[in-house]
Amino acid sequence: MKTRFFFNISLQDSIFFKNKKMKILITKTPGKEDIEFLWSKLREHGLSKISNPEVEEKFLFAILAKEGEVIQGGLLGQVYYKGMHVQLLWVDESLRKSGIGSSLLQKAEELARESKCNLIYLDTFSFQAPKFYEKWGFEVFGKIENFPDNFTRYFLVKRLL
């Protein structure tokens, strides 16, 4: 069962935007259908502005490092608008600095080039791997300091063309 939190701008149950009566709902457990609806509407709007079939290709992917049936490392990402977003790269702690992360990132870059991506982008925290990504040719284009406290979140990009 979903828990919904109501946020009222005034004492009224509803508010008006452009003569339409609406409620503003906050939920910490959004339903799959709500998430899919919002993403589809955002994508629909974006594609209406771009309208280039080459740019429209979109797919999710995973690159896994497995020992037998056990995942020892992996990279999740998404390709869209001629770019690749690396959502996460993880390697089992006992195998870090063994080359698995480099192999996963190299395979992702190969996939990005095959998919005609112009760039790869990602984010990482100061306690994770910003130096690792810089070693692979990524450049910091933004950062948020003290997020979380005493750490920095870095945003990096690698241009492929």
What are these regions (language model features)?
Residues 112-125:
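Conserved GNAT acetyl-CoA-binding A-motif
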Residues 38, 133, 138:
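Conserved active-site tyrosine of GNAT-family acetyltransferases
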Residues 3-30:
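Conserved N-terminal entry element of GNAT/NAT acetyltransferase domains
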Residues 48, 121-123, 139-155:
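Conserved catalytic-core motifs of GNAT/GCN5-like acyltransferases
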Residues 24-87, 92, 127, 146, ...:
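Acetyl-CoA-dependent GNAT
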Residues 101, 105, 126-129, 146-152:
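Short glycine/proline-centered loop/turn elements that form peptide/ligand docking sites
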Residues 97-110, 135:
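Conserved acetyl-CoA-binding loop-helix of GNAT-fold acetyltransferases
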